[in-house]
């Protein structure tokens, strides 16, 4: 199970995604933990079994157990937070004075370097489409001294994984329908 398997699973019309997937795994903008944590959190955020299985297997060989669990924790807590804060954002500030009241202890104590966890939350928030969360995590990353290039590379990784998941679903769905 691997990124290579995902590349092979992509249909011909997703050749750009295949090339981008190969390129992102060779990035020099992200260190190994940042890259594989971003890929794993993003794969979990896509809710695509094949993508998560393939990325998860390769990430398990690369990440420490703490980083592996933190990346999945980022995807999980952002699944909740992105819905809450995106939904609240639709309400024109009418609920901004109310406390969220949601437990999110992992954000304060992720078990890995805080900036890496924030990077994974940022990537997942982009996939989940929460502008408030994307902006908040980007701000936290910049305050921590993370470069714009590193942040953009994580965004690219999230976009690629999201596109791969969509292409695989489309291909599999049409193959079983036809």
Swiss-Prot record:
Homotrimer. Belongs to the AhpD family. Transmembrane segments: none annotated. The active site is at residues 130, 133. Antioxidant protein with alkyl hydroperoxidase activity. Required for the reduction of the AhpC active site cysteine residues and for the regeneration of the AhpC enzyme activity. Pfam families: CMD. It catalyses: N(6)-[(R)-dihydrolipoyl]-L-lysyl-[lipoyl-carrier protein] + a hydroperoxide = N(6)-[(R)-lipoyl]-L-lysyl-[lipoyl-carrier protein] + an alcohol + H2O. Its EC number is 1.11.1.28. GO terms for molecular function: alkyl hydroperoxide reductase activity; disulfide oxidoreductase activity; hydroperoxide reductase activity; peroxiredoxin activity. This is Alkyl hydroperoxide reductase AhpD. It is an enzyme of class 1 (oxidoreductase). SUPFAM superfamilies: AhpD-like. Disulfide bonds join 130-133. NCBIfam families: ahpD (TIGR00777), ahpD_dom (TIGR00778). The keyword Oxidoreductase applies. The keyword Hydrolase does not apply. Keywords: Antioxidant, Disulfide bond, Oxidoreductase, Peroxidase, Redox-active center. GO terms for biological process: cell redox homeostasis; response to oxidative stress.
């Amino acid at each position: 199970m691997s990124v290579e398997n995902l590349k092979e699973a992509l249909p011909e019309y997703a050749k750009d995604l295949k090339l981008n997937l190969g390129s992102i795994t060779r990035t020099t903008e992200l260190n190994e933990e940042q890259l594989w944590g971003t890929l794993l959190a993003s794969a979990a955020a896509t809710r695509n079994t094949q993508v998560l299985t393939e990325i998860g297997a390769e990430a398990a060989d690369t990440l420490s157990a703490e980083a592996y669990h933190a990346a999945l924790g980022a995807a999980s807590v952002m699944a909740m937070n992105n819905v809450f804060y995106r939904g609240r954002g639709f309400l024109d500030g009418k609920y901004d004075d109310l406390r969220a009241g949601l437990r999110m202890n992992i954000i304060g104590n992720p078990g890995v370097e805080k900036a890496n966890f924030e990077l994974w939350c940022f990537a997942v928030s982009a996939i989940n489409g929460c502008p408030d969360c994307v902006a908040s995590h980007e701000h936290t990353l910049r305050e921590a001294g993370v470069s714009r290039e590193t942040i953009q590379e994580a965004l690219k990784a999230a976009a690629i994984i999201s596109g791969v998941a969509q292409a695989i679903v489309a291909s599999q769905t049409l193959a079983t329908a036809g």
